[in-house]
Amino acid sequence: PGITXTSLHVAPGARLAVKGDIPAGAKSWVINLGKGENDIMLHFNARFDAHGDIRTIV
């Protein structure tokens, strides 16, 4: 479950900015970029409580 954007035209060297609100108590959030669910070129997974440290984003 989440937001899916399609038909993005991203050229080599382009930047992608992501902006949003993270709910209080969230432990992580994920961005997958690729042509499809099984063809991912970039997986970014920010975790806020990795290894018990809540002051570091891993």
UniProtKB/Swiss-Prot annotation:
InterPro entries: ConA-like_dom_sf (IPR013320), Galectin_CRD (IPR001079). A beta-D-galactoside binds at H43, F44, N45, A46, R47, H51. Residues 2-58 form the Galectin domain. It is found in: Secreted, Extracellular space, Extracellular matrix. It comes from the Eukaryota. GO terms for molecular function: carbohydrate binding. Pfam families: Gal-bind_lectin (PF00337). Keywords: Extracellular matrix, Lectin, Secreted. Its main location: secreted. Monomer. This is Galectin-1. It comes from Podarcis hispanicus.
